[in-house]
Amino acid sequence: MANSICIASSRLSLPTLLRNVFRSEFAADLGPRSEYKSLFAVQRAPLAYRRIRGPRQFSSLTLADDIPTTSKQPPSSAANVSSVPQPDEPAKTGAGEIRASSDPSEIVGSSPRTDSAKHKKASASEATIGAKPAANESSDKKCSGAPRTSSLSVLSKSKKKKEPWQIQKEALKKKFKEGWNPPKKLSPDALEGIRHLHAVAPDRFTTPVLAEQFQVSPEAIRRILKSKWRPSPEEMEKRRERWERRHDRIWSQMSELGLRRPKRSADKFSDVKVLYDKPV
């Protein structure tokens, strides 16, 4: 019995055996579920007329397993879905309507907030329109009052008696354009030197000569000479100390250049103190 071989089993080959097995499994899977049969037939319709020649491959037999199982709706519902207009079209039309009506002037309906805002704006504009005439009237009053006050001030100034210094200032302005307010200001030492030179030799150091020497107007020299202000003794002492420091600084610079500084033995021949010896 062990050595005996079945003739029917010897006729079976491996390809035919595998074909029978997969056919039975495929029929068992698709038998109770008719909806999958119809769906598979709809999706694989172009391949229905083809004949498979030769042994079937594993990739062609496993197509049923690759079919997605998520879409469980019947073919009737799929047909209904295909007959229903797609949702993209109304969405597009709605978007077009929204874009067309995005202009605020074309919007028919408005919310209560927008109505209240419009009402407030209208009331504010009316208030401003009503307030403008009052503002214009007040501005007209101010403008009409300003010329009156200016004219009154001019009249009061003209009627008021001028001071002597004002009369002199006006006369100087007419006679000397820059004499009453010279652009060049002289130092106190220069003013003292002008007074001293004019006091020592009035015939030599006249007003035009001093004006040319100090580069100021003759009127400025005249006012300097006419001035009665004199410095106090303390101020004179400070000026003398300042002049001495200036003298030392100048001679230190000259000694750096190679010039000799005067000695004390030559002080009696110097005329430095002449400025302080003679009265002003």
UniProtKB/Swiss-Prot annotation:
Domain of life: Eukaryota
Localisation per UniProt entry: Mitochondrion
Region annotated Disordered, chain positions: 63-166
Biased composition (Polar residues): 63-72
Main location: mitochondrion
Organelle targeting peptide span: 1-65
Similarity-based family: Belongs to the RRG9 family.
Full protein name: Required for respiratory growth protein 9, mitochondrial
Encoding gene, per UniProt annotation: rrg9
